Amino acid sequence: MASKRKSTTPCMIPVKTVVLQDASMEAQPAETLPEGPQQDLPPEASAASSEAAQNPSSTDGSTLANGHRSTLDGYLYSCKYCDFRSHDMTQFVGHMNSEHTDFNKDPTFVCSGCSFLAKTPEGLSLHNATCHSGEASFVWNVAKPDNHVVVEQSIPESTSTPDLAGEPSAEGADGQAEIIITKTPIMKIMKGKAEAKKIHTLKENVPSQPVGEALPKLSTGEMEVREGDHSFINGAVPVSQASASSAKNPHAANGPLIGTVPVLPAGIAQFLSLQQQPPVHAQHHVHQPLPTAKALPKVMIPLSSIPTYNAAMDSNSFLKNSFHKFPYPTKAELCYLTVVTKYPEEQLKIWFTAQRLKQGISWSPEEIEDARKKMFNTVIQSVPQPTITVLNTPLVASAGNVQHLIQAALPGHVVGQPEGTGGGLLVTQPLMANGLQATSSPLPLTVTSVPKQPGVAPINTVCSNTTSAVKVVNAAQSLLTACPSITSQAFLDASIYKNKKSHEQLSALKGSFCRNQFPGQSEVEHLTKVTGLSTREVRKWFSDRRYHCRNLKGSRAMIPGDHSSIIIDSVPEVSFSPSSKVPEVTCIPTTATLATHPSAKRQSWHQTPDFTPTKYKERAPEQLRALESSFAQNPLPLDEELDRLRSETKMTRREIDSWFSERRKKVNAEETKKAEENASQEEEEAAEDEGGEEDLASELRVSGENGSLEMPSSHILAERKVSPIKINLKNLRVTEANGRNEIPGLGACDPEDDESNKLAEQLPGKVSCKKTAQQRHLLRQLFVQTQWPSNQDYDSIMAQTGLPRPEVVRWFGDSRYALKNGQLKWYEDYKRGNFPPGLLVIAPGNRELLQDYYMTHKMLYEEDLQNLCDKTQMSSQQVKQWFAEKMGEETRAVADTGSEDQGPGTGELTAVHKGMGDTYSEVSENSESWEPRVPEASSEPFDTSSPQAGRQLETD
């Protein structure tokens, strides 16, 4: 510790402490908010911050023993009562919200000079940069009227300088006591540690300023936030960059980049001292004095040469983190930042350029690549432009014919034809390092046309899902011409491509996959012996293959000719943006185990020549009319029609092809939906002819019909949500009826075919057992009591219902699944005791009591309810339900005989509903649809015009 303090680099800096108190509340904890990148402080600085926070007066006017004055390069915002310190706004706000529950999350920022109101400190920063660009300091008054934090900003006349635009130092506080902001320099002694890789930029102090004025005292109730020192005559700020001894490996910038340089108004020059540093390798550092601005050369950068700079981007956490990680973003990083920050790419480039100018960072391309390698600890395999000769392919008559073929065989590569070449293709191979695109190395691909030779085995070009190099394997010979700097053995070295599967391995795996998509243990062991892969790798390959077969519908395979075939493994969909020299081509991989007809293949080349599902902006009405009229004539337009549409709609051929493809998909989806509706309607009509719904189909019916009156099946179908199992069942039935062998809508690679066939075989056993309303009632009562019945419960319910044990077990499993997904509508009603009409079990004596009361009064009076409950030992809900059923039966009987005037009047019904709380309506609407109950008085069908009539019970 003593040796550190003897160093010429200061490690103990006086702390500037400002105390702000709220006059109305003095005994509550203090909190502040941060701004700026997160930074770890040395223990000495942290101790100084703590001491200064406890005794602010002790630091005023103090200096170090060595005479070094605080540079005040950064801000440290600390929470007084929990010793939490941070320089990151997001981290400190998270601490406030989680640890201090009385913290107000929505402070208000007011600029009193301009009457400007902002909800966030970023908004106030943007306002200051726009309207107060010449001010160097601001005074903030923080109050908390009506439990709401208000930060008022004023501009003192004595501090106005053209130096720096003030940044708000705190987002807000709870205002109940005092706000302590410690403002300390961030100067950390660089040691040989992995985390101490930072680029320091220090502002030069003006020696003419007295040391005692470095920490002026501020009045209570105000805090003054200052940035920067005195400005020079021309308004420029000198910035010096630390030497290589104070920063270990400037390329590997893991930490924040410290120091800021303001963006001055147009016309004012800005002096920046730039020191271009070569790559620094691991070495021992010797402490030496920090350099001054005079020791480094000055570079004048006119601000007029820099486009408009958006100051609001400085507070964006995504941008700051990306810049701190590496100051030179890649194309992929810029695309990601464009999405998450909503700023255009050009503005992001300007921001990164300005930040590099502020920090004095200027690296050559070689230094950037070297720094990126060291930062990510990744060896980027740069293959020097080998030339691969493809032989024995009938399609290589010209480069134009083979371009699509190469593009399909090389997923993730950009294929183009350079100018001035007769038959060559330029294949740009993007190299990825930890998900970031690195430099691209173009591979010139020589295409030759060789006549067919009898007896030569076909060429199989195999590209696996992780292939980054091209392997062209010929059964007779393998020709590989590489540059002198790399040999063919090194190019195809197994250590480089250890994760790639060979052609023989893929052939064995795909052959087994075509036989069975779910291999057994014996098959997996056989594949491990044949391919040499581990069991885990084999199972993972099968899992990935099944996933792509399910999700990559409509993928195509190509058979170029009789002697050649291309097998392309499925890979994730990746889109690349090539350079301006190469035509923009985006590749989508294909899942190829199915062969298409040659005519279909040719059509696919014309429809989507680059396999890209591209989405375009909305079209004008006249364009849509022209496209719709052409689609009505022919969904697959010819070349002449495409040319006519291009001239008429001013759209590219690619856009027209994409529109037609989407339109065909939409039409196919509508036709499939209609077929499903017709199948469902036929199924329901057949079920009605048989006299009732089958049990399995009834249990799969969704809640669209529940609680509704009987209506035509077409209306019911429009309201239901059909589950996938239901659709499978319907497709199976339609297939059996029409004598077809495959289910419509399912691809040939779908693994659901075998499962669907098994389900069809199990149908007769499941639908043979039908449950009555009483059986379902008993099952539901037990389900409400326990969802996981014991063996005794199963035996009891089997004895009561007469159902076999497998049927009861299956019913409970289906009910638990439906309850988990919120589709068990009757559960809440049974839980409250609201049973369906006709299923209420009442003792004969109690029934006579209720019958006598009903014959006497014709309605249930509220004052007699408790007396009836005591006599019958029934609950009030059950008594009300019995009266509702009784009145419903009488109403239906009156409706059947046509004498509506003999039933209870409207007033009586109103009184009954008032006394009973409209119990029956609640039961009918909130419960699952009930089974139709045969009335005692009549066997005629129910009249659905009655509000209580025609309720259909449905199974769970």
UniProtKB/Swiss-Prot annotation:
Span list, region Required for repressor activity: 303-502
Keyword NAD attributed: no
Pfam families: Homeodomain (PF00046), Homez (PF11569), zf_C2H2_ZHX (PF18387)
First and last residues of each zinc finger (C2H2-type): 77-100, 109-132
Basic and acidic residues biased stretches: 666-677
GO (cellular component) term, any one: chromatin
Subcellular compartments: Nucleus
Highest taxon of the lineage: Eukaryota
Gene3D superfamilies hit by this protein: Classic Zinc Finger, Homeodomain-like
Disulfide bonds, paired cysteine numbers: none
Alphabetical list of InterPro entries matching this protein: HD, Homeodomain-like_sf, Homez_homeobox_dom, ZHX_Znf_C2H2, Znf_C2H2_sf, Znf_C2H2_type
Region annotated Required for nuclear localization, chain positions: 1-107, 497-555
Compositionally biased intervals (Acidic residues): 679-695
Tissue specificity as recorded in UniProt: Widely expressed. High expression in kidney. Expressed during osteogenic differentiation.
Induction details: Up-regulated during osteogenic differentiation of mesenchymal stem cells.
Residue ranges for the DNA-binding region feature of this UniProt entry: 304-363, 494-553, 612-671, 764-823, 835-894
One BP annotation, GO: cell differentiation
A GO molecular-function descriptor: protein heterodimerization activity
Complexes and interactors: Homodimer (via homeobox domain 1). Heterodimer with ZHX1 (via homeobox domain 1). Heterodimer with ZHX2 (via homeobox domain 1). Heterodimerization with ZHX1 is a prerequisite for repressor activity. Interacts with NFYA.
PANTHER family registered for this protein in UniProt: ZINC FINGERS AND HOMEOBOXES PROTEIN 3 (PTHR15467:SF6), ZINC-FINGERS AND HOMEOBOXES RELATED (PTHR15467)
Described purpose of this protein according to its UniProt entry: Acts as a transcriptional repressor. Involved in the early stages of mesenchymal stem cell (MSC) osteogenic differentiation. Is a regulator of podocyte gene expression during primary glomerula disease. Binds to promoter DNA.
Name recorded for this polypeptide: Zinc fingers and homeoboxes protein 3
Species per Swiss-Prot/TrEMBL record: Homo sapiens (Human)
Species classification: Eukaryota, Metazoa, Chordata, Craniata, Vertebrata
